[in-house]
Amino acid sequence: MFAKAFRVKSNTAIKGSDRRKLRADVAAAFPTLGTDQVSELVPGKEELNTVKLYAHRGDAVTVYVSGGNPILFELEKNLYPTVYMLWSHPDLLPTFTTWPLVLEKLVGGADLMLPGLVVPPAGLPQVQKGDLCAIALVGNRAPVAIGVAAMSTEEMLTSGLKGRGFSVLHTYQDHLWRSGDKSSPPSIAPLVVDPADLNDDKESVQVNPVLQGEEEGNGETALSEATSAGGQDQDPTDSRTLQEQMDELLQQCFLHALKCRIQKADLPLLTSTLLGSHMFSCCPEGHQLDIKKSSYKKLSKFLQHMQQEQIVQVKELSRGVESVVAVDWRHPRITSFVIPEPSLTSQSVQEGSREQPYRPPDIKPLYCVPASMTLLFQESGHKKGSVLEGSEVRAIIINYAKKNDLVDADNKNLVKLDPVLCDCLLEKHEQHSIMKLPWDSLVTRCLEKLQPAYQVTFPGQEPVVKKGKICPIDITLAQRASNKKVTVVRNLEAYGLDPGSVAATLQQRCQASTTVTPAPGAKDSLQVQIQGNQVHHLGRLLLEEYHLPRKYIQGLEHAPKASKKK
């Protein structure tokens, strides 16, 4: 809405009676704000102005300005917060996350398409169509845009995260933001994401039509056509229609999830979680579950049918959000359901993994030469992208200093900095003040300027070099319904661990239910969920039995504290 310049009609100070009305409107529009917070937003005596303007499309908008920054705007009698206001109240709206690469498109007036979303470990926030939402970037929870949800969370998951997700109204760096002090978003609770995922998703944004701008009216149609073409094709050997095949697959995944993945302790269970975390993971290899291609079209309609068969009971525990509250595990359809056998390939892999005990990989830190450091390394025959060990970097620095006669004659522990070393190792403000550096500082600065990489060598396999830092095994505690705690562990595959085997071992050790589900926001990765706080058992398994170094495991501090004996 504010991607282009707007025209200001008037700018007036707000009177006392209008301030009181605005406070009441803010409290009604954002009920989660306390009285003190509302009073802080709409102060009694400080400067507060009303700016009436026309957006570039002709929309009449009223903007409320406090302390020189726009904090609210009103459109068609609806109040919306600006990014300036959301930076002080980041949890005011349900927040969805996207990639930093996407922001430029949003600022240019594009709407956010669902393929551009990053799904956090806790799942997507629960919203209904038309709800006001905030949009943040990976690495920072501070909102950079606000928009209106084009569909509910359930519909987003049912669609397989395809289509238009949010109609964007206002963004950081648009013309409304420019009318304020132009401050940058604060750093709030950064999200941890696998660098490999970030690179993969950047490539997907460039290739796929994730965003649809104002001029691209037919972008969503093209996207839906592309996804339909790449979806599940009808089996030519099956005489049934695609809809009939999808109905059977839907019921198979549903019954499989109830029989193997869901425990009584998991109830009540959000219907969106049932689909996203359980049913999708029960889909057989080579098939794709798409409810829209079934006769039910929507998950809610399918669950109504299952409720009529008295398999489950579904209730709306909060407005617009349905949950499965009861399951009849003695129902004939569940008891008679036969779990599909895995493929021969997966069976042989699992059997082979049982024969040999787990041995941890050898992980060696490496360094890549970036473009900014090529001048320093080209004398030794290296170029941009060359991968080096730390000892090699140290040797190259020493040889460079000696070859160019940079060792200080009066103090052999110091190295004089020539123009190449200055450009490569010093910050701009240091280049006129630092003329010499000790050897250790010289090498340390060089290592910090290089890009991280690592080499993983599994027993009996060839070494594999990857860019970025290896993601540690991540252990977190999450709160589920009725204040029940669960332990969630991710990134096991990076260390050659099979999540299914780890889950089975923990189930026996902890005497607690375990589930293996797709890790939200991580491509082709699984996470293990264990009932209760099982960090202590998990730590013993990883450290003492699997012999993984402690530095590659994060979250061990969440283990319950030992009770003191009286």
UniProtKB/Swiss-Prot annotation:
Annotated SMART domains? PUA
> What GO cellular component entries does it have?
cytoplasm
Q: Give start and end of each PUA domain.
A: 93-173
What are the recorded Gene Ontology BP terms?
A: formation of translation preinitiation complex
Q: Which residues carry this modification: N-acetylmethionine?
A: M1
Role, per record: Translation initiation factor that is able to deliver tRNA to the P-site of the eukaryotic ribosome in a GTP-independent manner. The binding of Met-tRNA(I) occurs after the AUG codon finds its position in the P-site of 40S ribosomes, the situation that takes place during initiation complex formation on some specific RNAs. Its activity in tRNA binding with 40S subunits does not require the presence of the aminoacyl moiety. Possesses the unique ability to deliver non-Met (elongator) tRNAs into the P-site of the 40S subunit.
The name this protein goes by in its record = Eukaryotic translation initiation factor 2D
Instruction: Identify the species of origin.
Output: Oryctolagus cuniculus (Rabbit)
